[in-house]
């Protein structure tokens, strides 16, 4: 099968969407399929075979993210020459619209993965800040109506999306490459940041944006450290809130107990998961919470707010705890796991076992079956 992927975010930009595309593309190619990616260009990007880059501009609100200018005199000729079987778009914006136009022009099936609750990200779009969340949901629903299949990562997101579109919606979680977690250096994190063996490491990993609710985690940690001074909170990643979060940590008097690593290499990220004792996650907007799945693969129990996709990534009381958005409850669950080493070890074992259900290989096979069914429906509809 020959698959065209259109995305508004791709390497070297880092995000859950980019990681999802990387992992899925690798697995599809391992299964013998040909994958071609259409994405924005970034300064100093690495040229890759099968990746077509489009001129782009940095966004005013977050310069690290580039918005593609979806214009190319060669795009239709390129799509024709590639002889694609299906087009798969990963956002409803500039590259997503280009993918739709190409699918329409060449009569190809169009698949859309709904990675993000777009209504929760309006504050990043200066041209759309006045749009209400209801309007954004309707607009994204209208894009779904143009597609032949909409893929979502969890059942709770399916229920939300299905209310706003007539298109078939199917649940296929983003798979995680468990092989990455086989050979890890569990001591790397402590060596890198000079953390003693007695100190417990709390970890958060992700883009530091307002919607990730990292300020909540800092407020919680300020309570945790009162009882457990021999802990450290490591925050991996960068984003528009990086500086304000650093300032908040210092204002709260925990600046010396919180380590902001900035962006790390993939190997360093894996070793960070492997070297931590507990993963913390407070986002209210995740469609899946890919980092929660990665934490599982490292055998790392998590405490997370029970919201949207995160609620389906953690089995409450088995491989972690889900809480309400209440600081006292969240703090209580962290303290419970820090107090009880045996409970934490058992949850770590459970997390590792349950990670088998979200392997990237099995999810890629499920995606291929969805492609095949969509292509078949499209062909049948054409002859009716």
Question: Which residues does each predicted region cover?
Answer:
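N-terminal subdomain of nucleotide-sugar transferases
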Residues: 1-55, 362-368, 372, 382-383
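Donor nucleotide-sugar binding/catalytic pocket of nucleotide-sugar-dependent glycosyltransferases
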Residues: 52-55, 133, 137-186, 261
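Short alpha-helical donor nucleotide-sugar binding micro-motif in glycosyltransferases
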Residues: 79, 144, 261-264, 271-276
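Conserved donor-binding/catalytic core segment of Leloir-type glycosyltransferases
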Residues: 195-221
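Nucleotide-activated donor-binding/catalytic signature segment of Leloir-type glycosyltransferases, i.e.
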Residues: 243-264
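Aromatic "clamp/platform" in nucleotide-sugar-dependent glycosyltransferases that forms part
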Residues: 284
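Short hydrophobic beta-strand element within catalytic cores of glycosyltransferases
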Residues: 301-304
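Conserved acidic donor-binding segment of nucleotide-sugar-dependent glycosyltransferases
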Residues: 316-317, 321-327, 336-342
């Amino acid at each position: 099968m020959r698959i065209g992927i259109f995305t508004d975010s791709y390497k070297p930009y880092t995000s859950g969407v980019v990681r999802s595309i990387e992992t899925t593309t690798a697995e599809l190619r391992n299964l013998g399929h040909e994958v071609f990616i259409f994405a924005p260009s970034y300064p100093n990007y690495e040229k890759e075979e099968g990746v077509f880059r489009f001129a782009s501009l940095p966004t005013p609100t977050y310069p690290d993210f580039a918005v593609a200018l979806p214009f190319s005199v060669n795009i239709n000729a390129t799509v024709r020459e590639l002889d694609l079987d299906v087009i798969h778009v990963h956002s409803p914006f500039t590259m997503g619209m280009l993918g739709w136009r190409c699918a329409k022009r060449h009569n190809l099936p169009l698949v859309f993965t709904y990675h993000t609750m777009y209504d929760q990200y309006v504050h990043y779009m200066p041209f759309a800040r006045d749009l209400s969340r209801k309007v954004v949901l309707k607009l994204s629903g209208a894009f779904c109506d143009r597609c032949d299949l909409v893929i979502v990562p969890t059942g709770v997101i399916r229920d939300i999306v299905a209310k706003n579109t007539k298109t078939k919606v199917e649940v296929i979680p983003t798979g995680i490459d468990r092989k990455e977690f086989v050979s890890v250096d569990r001591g790397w994190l402590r060596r890198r940041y000079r953390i003693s063996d007695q100190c417990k490491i709390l970890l958060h990993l992700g883009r530091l944006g307002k919607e990730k609710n990292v300020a909540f985690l800092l407020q919680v940690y300020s309570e945790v450290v009162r009882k457990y001074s021999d802990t450290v909170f490591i925050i991996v990643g960068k984003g528009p809130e990086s500086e304000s979060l650093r300032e908040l940590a210092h204002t709260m008097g925990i600046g010396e107990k919180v380590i902001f690593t900035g962006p790390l290499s993939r190997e360093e990220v894996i070793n960070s998961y492997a070297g931590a004792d507990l993963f913390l996650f407070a986002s209210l907007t995740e469609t899946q919470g890919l980092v929660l799945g990665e934490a599982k693969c490292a055998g790392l129990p998590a405490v997370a707010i029970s919201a949207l996709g995160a609620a389906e990534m953690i089995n409450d009381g088995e491989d972690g705890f889900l809480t309400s958005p209440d600081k006292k409850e969240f703090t209580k669950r962290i303290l419970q796991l820090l107090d009880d080493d045996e409970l934490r070890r058992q949850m770590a074992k459970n997390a590792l076992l349950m990670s088998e259900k979200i392997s990237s290989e099995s999810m890629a096979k499920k995606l291929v079956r969805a492609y095949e069914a969509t292509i078949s429906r499209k062909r049948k509809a054409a002859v009716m």
